[in-house]
Each structure stands twice: as structure tokens, then as C-alpha cells.
Amino acid sequence: MTDTDLITAGESTDGKPSDAAATDPPDLNADEPAGSLATMVLPELRALANRAGVKGTSGMRKNELIAAIEEIRRQANGAPAVDRSAQEHDKGDRPPSSEAPATQGEQTPTEQIDSQSQQVRPERRSATREAGPSGSGERAGTAADDTDNRQGGQQDAKTEERGTDAGGDQGGDQQASGGQQARGDEDGEARQGRRGRRFRDRRRRGERSGDGAEAELREDDVVQPVAGILDVLDNYAFVRTSGYLPGPHDVYVSMNMVRKNGMRRGDAVTGAVRVPKEGEQPNQRQKFNPLVRLDSINGGSVEDAKKRPEFGKLTPLYPNQRLRLETSTERLTTRVIDLIMPIGKGQRALIVSPPKAGKTTILQDIANAITRNNPECHLMVVLVDERPEEVTDMQRSVKGEVIASTFDRPPSDHTSVAELAIERAKRLVEQGKDVVVLLDSITRLGRAYNNASPASGRILSGGVDSTALYPPKRFLGAARNIEEGGSLTIIATAMVETGSTGDTVIFEEFKGTGNAELKLDRKIAERRVFPAVDVNPSGTRKDELLLSPDEFAIVHKLRRVLSGLDSHQAIDLLMSQLRKTKNNYEFLVQVSKTTPGSMDSD
């Protein structure tokens, strides 16, 4: 190598920093005024700071980034460097490929920037992982974010390979693509940060999240007491504060609270909700106020509710305790039912009635008789798909809990009301109480399930879906007498002779499920004879468990006499004899005296 070549090489090194362009970021070495930095957007400033080696840029603001970049430039321009001539002499003596710092232990600020610009992408990826937990909250470690980081790393590696192969002329393109990649990564970090902040804000406000987290109650929060019936759905629960139907003031209950406290559907719950403070903006995504405190379940403590038995594990028995319905001399409906179809605690009775046969009046008389003669029983009247005026009449005439869903409501409301009502009755039975449920009617409930349930593809005659018959049968099958204490009595009406094939199919499904049946006759009702009871097909299974031996023998004689007559003559004879006596006891004594030969014939 001649002296001319050495001089040329030295001039190329000093005058045209072409080799340094591949390693030194030109925008950092250039003396850019502060105004040009102020015009850059935040992702560009972060990318520039990352190339300069500034760490933690994801949490910096714009003015902080500008200050950090200017500090790096001042260190690079004004630092005490090694004598320039000595460096040039050393570079001239060494081969051009060994253009490295004079000492490996110490580096000047300019050389630090060069080395940091070469390692900008690995450091940025590590900085992203380090800043992830602090910047993006609890969601920084999700699988989606890891996938984004892996894809970004692969793209960075490809960019580095292309930049290495292209040489010094493509150094600017490599840095430009690196800047775009950095901006994309920083945008991802910004999105992660926003998601993390939103998640933390939701946790602080007590908004429910996907895992059903409970709402947090602070010391300075003002609470308001609430009470209602718990309705547990698939992944959430509500306290129905306005009855058994959904309302605008229902209270949300997290599934964690339901499982932790052993809460069940139909529980009577009391607790508290947080009252929004003055000037506090309501959460637009939070439609219902969450329950922040649980005080009692079914009038008892929460610990007692965890120890209660399950309704399905209780032992069912035949009814053995009678519910007497006779109230007064002139109330013949209940007197006839006591003689023809005696009812016990835990009975599953059906009142089979054609239209306009007086079934609603019979239900009212039964309800009033139960509240008068058996005040220990909890009475619930469930009216499904009923006329609004009949609901009002029932509420005013019955001293009990009337749960209604009128016919102008959608079928889903009919089914939800019936399900929540029977679940409420089960919760009372688990406490050892006697509950009587009067349902009007099981046929209309079957219609509602047929209209509300999705089609299964198997349609029976009359357009009845096969899956729509099970839920009302489950409702009726809940009636039972519990050996451990408590009972659930269900008296439901079933409509026949309506001219609808679907009603006939529904009735045939329930025909063998009841253990007591009271059949009404339309022809008797057309003669204006009430109650229009068809005596011969009506009766109770295992009625000897409800009647005393003497009473059972006399009733047996009476039914033998009435069986020889047609339905019209039988009810006329029975009604005429009941009007002559003050009560059923006197009537049975009279029957035993007037038919002595029947006992001998037996």
C-alpha cells in the first residue's frame, strides 16, 4: 500500500463517513434543532429514543422524550474525545475491517450511540417485556401479546438480515424500516397500556369482569339496603327487587358471591348496594348496580344457608296430614272437595276443567280456605298467561302471595315467573315449612314453553315440541311430602275440551302424574250448578292415609251410592243433602244412619 492510498483512505474516513453511516444513526449525529423534535409525533420520538439507547420510553411523555434525546446529543457532541489525529493514525496503521474503538473497556458517547443503534431492536424487545407488566396492567402477559412480540421479533430479524446483506448504501432504509417497526411496537404497547388502565379502572369501580369478580366496598362509600328474590342464570345472577319478573332496579350478583355463600335460585336475599356519590359519572357499561354486601339469606344467617339440605335429596312420602278446606255452611265448594277429593300436605292435584266451568272460583275458594284453616302454610298463587282483571281479582280476594304474568307479556316471562316461583317454594321447603302452590294453569304454561323453547325437530301432534313438555312436568313433579319435615303441595288446573289438539297432548302428558284429580263438567256448569264437579271420576289416591277409619268407611258408602247415578244426578243429590246440614261431620253422620244396609253388603 502506497502513501497515496493511505492518504486517500484517511480522507475518505474523515471527509465522507460512509462506513459510519452504516453504524451511526444520522439523525442523532446531525445537529437537529429542538423545534424539529417538537413537530414529531409520539411514536416517532419513542423510536428515535430507542435507537439512542433510552430505556423505559413506553412510560415517557413527549417533553420527557425530547429532553432525553437532547441530552444524548449533548453528550455525543461535547464529550472529551480522544485526539482526532491519533485516531486517524491508528486507523491508517490497522486494516480497514478492524474499525473498532481504541480500547474495549471504555467507549466514547458517540461510539456508545453507534453500538446502541446496532442493538436497538433486541433492547426494544426486552424493554417491551420489562415495561409490559407496569404499562399494560394484568393483561400484558396474554397469549395475544406474546404472539405479537414473536411476530415482531421475526420481522426484525428479517430486516436485520436484509440490512446486513445490502451494505452501507442501504443503512438508511434499514433504519427507516426499523423506525416503522418500532412505531408499530410502540402502538401495540400503547394499546396494551390503555387496556390495562381500563381493566384497573373497572376493578376499582367494582364493575363485573369475565370471571365474576365481586364488587369492592370502600370505607367512604354510602350503601343502600336492598331485598328481593335471587334469580341465578347461566353465568350471572340478579336480585329481583320488584317481584319475580325482571325490572330496571334489579341488583347484579357475581357468581363468586353465589358460590362462596351457597346461594340458590329462589333465595330471599337482603344486602346493600353502593350509592353513587355527587358528581360521580355513572358507568355506561354497568347497567345494574352490583351487590356489595350480603346480610341474610331467607331470613337467617349466611352460615346457616350453607348447611341446609338440598331439595332433591329429601325423601318424598305420600301425604299423611290433611288440609281441611271446609270453612262455612254456605261455602259448598270446599265442602264438596273435602268429601270427594281430600287434600293433604304434599298433594299433587289436578283440577281438570273445560272452559267456563268455574275453575278460577274454585281456586279462590281453596286459597281462602287454606289461609283460614291452615295459617302455618305459605300460600303462593301462580297465574300464567292470565287475564289482567282476574289477576287483580285474585290479589284482592286472596290473602297470600300472588305471582302473575298476564297474557300480554312474552312467553319467556311466563316461563321465568313459573320457574322462579317453584324454586322459591323449594327453598322454603328446605327450611321445613309447608308450602301450597296454586297454578292456573298447567296447560297455558305448557303452551308458553312450547313457544319460548327452541325447536328440537321432533314435533308432536298439535304442533307441540317434544322438549316443551318436560319443564311443566318438572314443575308439577316438585310436589311432595318430605319425611324430614316440610311439604310442597301443588294444585294446578288443566284445560280440556278446548278444541285444540295441542291442549289435549299437553293434558295427556300430565294425566298420570297427579295423585288427586277433580274433574269439572261443562254440562253441569251450563245448568248453572256450581261447583260443577263430576263426582265419579274425581278422587284422591291413598285417601285412607288422610281420613280416619270411621270417616273413610262412611265416605266409601257415599261414593257407592253416588256411583249408581249419572253425573248430573250425583252432584244434585250431594248438593241438596249438604244444604240440609251445617257441616260435613253432620252430613256424614246422617249418611251413616240413612244407609245402614250398605255396611252389611260390604
Curated annotation (Swiss-Prot):
Q: Which SMART domains has this protein been placed in?
A: AAA, CSP, Rho_N
Question: Could you give one GO CC term from the UniProt record?
Answer: peptidoglycan-based cell wall
Extent of Basic residues compositional bias: 193-206
Listed GO biological process terms: DNA-templated transcription termination; termination of RNA polymerase I transcription
- Provide the E.C. number(s) assigned to this enzyme: 3.6.4.-
Q: Which keywords has UniProt assigned to this entry?
A: ATP-binding, Helicase, Hydrolase, Nucleotide-binding, RNA-binding, Transcription, Transcription regulation, Transcription termination
Residues the record lists as binding ATP: G344, K345, G346, Q347, R348, A349, K356, A357, G358, K359, T360, T361, R387
- Amino-acid biosynthesis found in the keyword field: no
One Pfam family for this entry, by name?
A: ATP-synt_ab
Modulation of this protein's activity: The antibiotic bicyclomycin inhibits ATPase activity but does not affect termination function.
Q: Where is the Rho RNA-BD domain?
A: 223-301
Q: Which GO terms describe its molecular function?
A: ATP binding; ATP hydrolysis activity; ATP-dependent activity, acting on RNA; helicase activity; RNA binding
Where along the chain is composition biased (Low complexity)?
172-182
Q: Which CDD domains match?
A: rho_factor_C
Q: Which InterPro entries match?
A: AAA+_ATPase (IPR003593), ATPase_F1/V1/A1_a/bsu_nucl-bd (IPR000194), CSD (IPR011129), NA-bd_OB-fold (IPR012340), P-loop_NTPase (IPR027417), Rho-like_N (IPR011112), Rho_factor_ATP-bd (IPR041703), Rho_N_sf (IPR036269)
Q: Polar residues compositional bias: what residue ranges?
A: 100-120
The segment annotated Disordered runs over 1-35, 76-216
Q: Which Gene3D superfamilies match?
A: Nucleic acid-binding proteins, P-loop containing nucleotide triphosphate hydrolases
Listed Basic and acidic residues bias regions: 85-96, 183-192
Protein's UniProt keywords contain Hydrolase: yes
What the protein does comes down to: Facilitates transcription termination by a mechanism that involves Rho binding to the nascent RNA, activation of Rho's RNA-dependent ATPase activity, and release of the mRNA from the DNA template. Shows poor RNA-dependent ATP hydrolysis and inefficient DNA-RNA unwinding activities, but exhibits robust and fast transcription termination, which suggests that the transcription termination function of M.tuberculosis Rho is not correlated with its helicase/translocase activities and that these functions may not be important for its RNA release process.
Partners and quaternary state? Homohexamer. The homohexamer assembles into an open ring structure. Does not bind NusG.
The Swiss-Prot or TrEMBL note on domains reads: Contains an extra N-terminal domain, a S1-like RNA-binding domain and a conserved P-loop NTPase domain.
State the remark under miscellaneous: Was identified as a high-confidence drug target.
Family named by the database record = Belongs to the Rho family.
State the protein's name: Transcription termination factor Rho
Q: Could you tell me which species this protein originates from?
A: Mycobacterium tuberculosis (strain ATCC 25618 / H37Rv)
